[in-house]
Amino acid sequence: MAVRAVRGAVQLERDEAGHMDEQVGALLTEILERNDLAADDLISIWFTATPDLHSDFPAAAARKLGIVDVPLICAQELDIEGAMPRVVRVLAHIESDRPRADIAHVAVGAAAALRKDIAQ
C-alpha cells in the first residue's frame, strides 16, 4: 500500500452548521466512494474553510459520518481578494494500491472551477 493524497472542495450556499454538515458529508462520501475507500484507509484529513465561514468546524461532518479515529484538523484558507466565497477544501491522506494517476479528486458544483486540472 502506498500513501496517497486526495483533494476535494465544495462551495456552500450559506453559512449554516446543518448545511455545512450536509455538504461536507456528501463531499467526503463521494471521495470515499470514487476511490473505493473505507474509513480504515484514511490516515488523516485536513480541512480548510474560507474566512467567511463561521458556523461550524468542517471536521464535524466527518465525525458525524462515523470517521472517529482518524486525525482531523481545520484551518482557515487565505483571504485572497476575488477568491470564491464559502468554500470548504479537503486534503485526505490515504492508504491505497491505486496509482497516483488513478486517484479521483472531487470538486462539487461551482467548486469544480477551482481546480479544473484535477476535478473529476
What are the language-model segments listed below?
Residues M1-Q120:
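Terminal domain-initiation and capping elements
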